[in-house]
Design a protein with these regions (language model features):
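ATP-binding Walker
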Residues: 9-12
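Conserved beta-strand segments of alpha/beta enzyme cores
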Residues: 26-28, 104
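A glycine- and Lys/Arg-enriched "phosphate-lid" helix/loop adjacent to the NTP-binding pocket
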Residues: 49-51, 96, 100-146
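Walker A/P-loop
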Residues: 15
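Extreme N-terminal starter segment of soluble prokaryotic enzymes
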Residues: 1-4
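ATP-dependent small-molecule kinase phosphotransfer cores
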Residues: 28-83, 88-95, 126-127, 132-135, ...
Length: 146
């Protein structure tokens, strides 16, 4: 069993890689974002970039720096299939997954303006932001030390 972790900036193409690996290579997809959205629903909060970041940080503070991806890794193990864990964000998550011995990390990036245009076109509720907010959010997310 192989676990591929995908990290990268917003709108860089992580989803495109996931789509290829699931449709063409039979990988099973696990999403940090979807895991966090479920947690937000459980506590009655709307999913947006701020609440997703907030709940992720609270889970990490209450449990461990790698809590979210550890939970997804356990689900992946149960599947017995090659898996993708998408939207890995912190060094703690990467370090924990590397310890498994069956983990490869892909990092994806693209020019900020291209990425902003991509998120604007996909029209997700969490992506309805100005370019200035997009850049500010990205700078804030890059500051995480967990």
């Amino acid at each position: 069993m192989l676990i591929i972790g995908i990290t990268g900036t917003l709108g860089a193409g992580k989803g495109t890689i996931v789509e290829f690996l699931t449709s063409q290579k039979g990988f099973v997809h696990y999403s940090v974002r979807e895991f966090l959205k479920k947690k937000l629903l459980e506590i009655g909060l709307e999913a947006n970039r701020d609440t997703l970041t907030m709940v992720a940080n609270k889970l990490r503070e209450a449990n461990s720096a790698s809590y979210v991806t550890d939970q997804l890794y356990e689900e992946a193990l149960q599947s017995g299939s090659n898996c993708i864990i998408e939207s890995i964000r912190t060094p703690g998550e990467i370090a924990s997954l590397r310890k498994t011995g069956n983990f490869v990390l892909f990092a994806v990036d693209a020019d900020p303006l291209i990425r902003y245009k991509r998120i604007y076109l996909r029209g997700s509720e969490t992506d309805k932001i100005s370019y200035e907010v997009f850049i500010a959010n990205e700078a804030r997310e890059m500051q995480s030390t967990n």
